Amino acid sequence: MRDARPGGELDYIGGIRGFERRLVANHPMRGQLRYHELVVRSLRSAGLSVHSVLDPARLAASVPQAWWMLGRLRPAALFTTGGYLAMPLVLAARARSIPTLVWEGNVQPGRATRAIGRFATRVAVSFPPTLAAFPGNSFVSGTPIRSFDGIDRAAARHSFGLDPGDRLLVVFGGSQAVARMNAAVARALPQLVADWHVLHLAGDDGMADAGAARQALPDALRLRYTAEPFLTDRMADALVAADLVVGRAGSSTCAELAAVGVPSILVPYPYAGAHQRYNARYLVNEGAAVEIPDDELTSERLLAETEALLHDHRRHAMADAARRLGRPHAARMLADELVALAEGGPLPSTVPS
């Protein structure tokens, strides 16, 4: 937004849990973001419970508050990624004739996004199959990700101590249920390092076990295994350097794998509405990844899948397929669309390319 509309004012509306406030307080653009709190309780899954009665009441009570807030802020446009805050804000924005852009990051939309999509001006989605859930007002933007511009693969590989003929396997589980992935890597490690250099992002809680697994390796193989808790500042370099990635299937992970063009073995997080399972299957169906269900992730299965991808020609075909799915400039596309909505100009998403 800073580049698409220099000098524009940005207001961030968050909830009462405090997470959003901390997010804004720690953001590099915090001096340009004004935080506002909307008192809305999270809505629960509908069912035969007290929440099936309370949720509609909570929603109805929150719409006037959202109406008042938008009347005070008078935004030119509203952007939301869904969630429990989105419904009252989108309803209030529609009533006030404020254009709204909703973004859905997963192949299978969440309940809130499905509901508010009917009231939004435009709905941006990360994956083409999601268009069917929002007929008439949706377009494919991709997922906003970090920039990979200017990263040289040879230089990135050199920074991790790789020789030209080495294969780099990068393993990471994000913040969700990484213990199962760590255990599979630890048991498979002696065989893995025979074929790959392994960069394993084990999380803070996994570092002790990763260190023990490294010490158990023969001296000649220890240099082929590197464990780190996280790799925030060098993650882009790691993905560019990688020959194969083992990871979860969140929207951002899938988008970054596609932007870089790296083949992957995806282990979808099995909870949170099973969104990651649908994301993974899209990449699998497009030939860019293989999938291991979370409950089938064992050292034996991990070894079988990595060994099947030792051959360069199969990995190269998967890399090409991933690259065809990449939308590395999604953030700018969303920003341009939002500015056009705010200014009443032609929408970039409707202009033929």
Residue ranges of each PLM-predicted region?
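Acidic donor-binding loop of glycosyltransferase active sites
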Residues: 75-77, 239-253, 262
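C-terminal "capping" alpha-helix adjacent to the active site of nucleotide-linked donor transferases
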Residues: 292-293, 297-314
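Conserved nucleotide-sugar phosphate-binding/catalytic loop shared by glycosyltransferases and other
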Residues: 6-61, 141-143, 204-206, 293-295
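Active-site-proximal region of nucleotide-activated glycan assembly enzymes
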Residues: 4, 32, 94-154
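A short helix/loop element that forms part of the nucleotide-sugar donor recognition site in Leloir-type
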Residues: 150-162, 314
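Donor-nucleotide binding loops and adjacent catalytic segments primarily
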Residues: 23-27, 43, 162-247, 277-281, ...
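A short, well-ordered alpha-helix in the C-terminal region of glycosyltransferases
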Residues: 314-328
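C-terminal alpha-helical cap of glycosyltransferases
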Residues: 327-353
